[in-house]
From Swiss-Prot:
Pfam families: Intron_maturas2, MatK_N. The gene is matK. GO terms for molecular function: RNA binding. InterPro entries: Domain_X, Maturase_MatK, Maturase_MatK_N. Keywords: Chloroplast, mRNA processing, Plastid, RNA-binding, tRNA processing. One of its GO terms (biological process) is RNA splicing. Belongs to the intron maturase 2 family. MatK subfamily. This is Maturase K. The lineage of its organism: Eukaryota, Viridiplantae, Streptophyta, Embryophyta, Tracheophyta. Usually encoded in the trnK tRNA gene intron. Probably assists in splicing its own and other chloroplast group II introns. It comes from the Eukaryota.
């Protein structure tokens, strides 16, 4: 009965757009507690029951409610200090509770109409990792120019909070959220982007991710709207993106002049459409048009960040390159387009001649050095790539230890299965296998050689050596016509069922 009452209370709060009372409900932090300690494949199964208590969380929330959070000054973080116990642990749990509550108005607005439901369906497809990989494989080889850029972080947290203010109709919730963030980070001065990125990467607060996604969503809503409008310009007389930076001005006279005097120039801008891909904080712009058009989009992005979001970005941070000249880093891969030269001998009557054909081929390579650095940070190996044991896992059973290593190894294998060269992937598998063996040997207080000799490595770790094709996975066959007939290849990215945590350490 209590469970139904909880859902009824949540539904009433959604309908009334008044979420402030939910902040002080204990069950919210019960949900947050479970989410926080089960959110990553690299999480340690430590007994947190001795370190935390929902009663303490409730006291902290009650103490927050007794403060004057409707008025915030620069010195509030010194006067209103309510952290007493395990600061990192309880701040994480409270932030998870805040994230659960502040996500409610977003889900309410997105489900309020069929039109908005279509919008969120479009954006889900746009941001799906299963749609990015096929885009790279199918489209990238036909494009000429790529511009990769990291979306700049706001210089101050207040920018993120104000973006959320546009959506939230609950003023007390907005002020309490701001108070919590000021208390947690002790924001007396402006935070530099370097410090903000460092804080974000270390804490991984869900509420910060939520606010940052709001910030990125607003940026993309403006940029993609203009991009979609520009793609339709070629269907009318407004086919010019030439010298256009401010998109809201009237350009009838502009088009008339250029069509009359520079008609020969318009052939370069018949298709101003560009492709946009974004994963986490990095975005890629790609086009098959001239570099001049891509430079115009680059300048527009910089002005959009500077004037609309008050975020400073240097023009050199967005680099424009040809695919054949430079590789780029996205989704944990190093990717580039390589030109393959081939010669075909053709004979016509008595004359024979050679035809040279240039074909583009997409190459995706696993960046082994950043990956080993991430594995070293997760304590699977040292900085040189030599496998080490996991002492925190040595207290588990043999089956649990093998299952943990096997699960992580399979997730990474599925994620990097699209690599053109498998040598780096084999090295990663070797690190996990030997790290697993060393952990088991540490548990049984034996050397690796003696442990393998006593138990037998083949039977104990046979699942590690199982071929990927024999593992039950979501694999379909894709047919493509080639010169040799019908080729059946694996759609490898459908195997990805878990986000790659190591991509966050790029």
């Amino acid at each position: 009965m209590e469970e139904y009452q909880v859902y009824l209370e949540l539904d009433i709060s959604r309908q009334q757009h008044f979420l402030y009372p939910l902040i002080f409900r204990e069950y919210i932090y019960g949900l947050a507690y479970g989410h926080y300690f089960n959110g990553s494949i690299f999480s340690e199964n430590v007994d947190y029951d001795n370190k935390s208590s929902l009663l303490i969380v409730k006291r902290l929330i009650t103490r927050m409610s007794q403060q004057n959070h409707l008025i915030i000054s620069a010195n509030d973080s010194k006067k209103n200090q309510f952290w007493g116990y395990n600061k990192n642990l309880y701040s994480q749990i409270i932030s998870e509770g805040f994230a659960i509550v502040v996500e409610i108005p977003l889900s309410l607005q997105l489900n309020s109409s069929s039109e908005e439901a279509e919008i969120i369906k479009y954006y889900k497809n746009l941001r799906s990792i299963h749609s990015i990989f096929p885009f790279f494989e199918d489209k990238l080889t036909y494009l000429n120019y790529v511009s990769d850029a990291r979306i700049p972080y706001p210089i101050h947290l207040e920018i993120l909070v104000q973006v959320f203010r546009y959506w939230a109709k609950d003023a007390p919730l907005f002020h309490l959220l701001r108070l919590f963030l000021y208390e947690y980070w002790n924001w007396n001065n402006l935070i530099t982007p370097k410090k903000l990125i460092s804080t974000f990467s270390k804490s991984h607060l869900r509420v910060f991710l939520f606010l940052y996604n709001f910030y990125v969503c607003e940026y993309e809503s403006i940029f993609l709207f203009l991009r979609n409008k520009s793609s339709h310009l070629r269907l009318t007389s407004f086919s010019l993106l030439f010298e256009r930076i401010y998109f809201y001005g009237k350009i009838e006279h502009f088009v008339e002049v250029f069509v009359k005097d520079f008609s020969s120039t318009l052939s370069f801008f018949k298709e101003p459409f560009i492709h946009y891909v974004r994963y986490q904080g990095k975005s890629i712009l790609a086009s098959k048009n001239a570099s001049l058009l891509m430079n115009k989009w680059k300048n527009y992005l910089i002005r959009l960040w500077q004037y609309h979001f008050d975020v400073w970005s240097q023009p050199r941070t967005i680099q424009l390159n040809q695919f054949s000249e430079r590789s780029f880093h996205l989704l944990g891969y190093f990717s580039n387009v390589r030109l393959n030269l081939s010669a075909i001998r053709s004979q016509m009557l008595e004359n024979a001649f050679l035809i040279k054909i240039v074909m583009k081929k997409l190459e995706t390579i696993v960046p082994i050095i950043p990956l080993i650095r991430s594995l070293a940070k997760a304590k699977f190996c040292n900085v040189l790539g030599h496998p080490i044991s996991k002492p925190l896992w040595a207290d588990s059973s043999d089956f649990d230890i093998i299952d943990r290593f096997l699960r992580i190894c399979r997730n990474l294998s599925h994620y990097y299965n699209g690599s053109s060269k498998k040598k780096s992937l084999y090295r990663v598998k070797y690190i996990f296998r030997l790290s697993c063996i060393k952990t088991l040997a540490r548990k049984h207080k034996s050397t690796v050689r003696a442990f393998l000799k006593r138990l037998g490595s083949e039977k104990l770790l046979e699942e590690f050596f199982t071929e990927e094709e024999e593992i039950l996975s979501l694999v379909f066959q894709r047919a493509s016509s080639t010169l040799q007939g019908l080729y059946r290849g694996r759609i490898w990215y459908l195997d990805i069922i878990f986000s790659n945590d190591l991509v966050n350490h790029e």
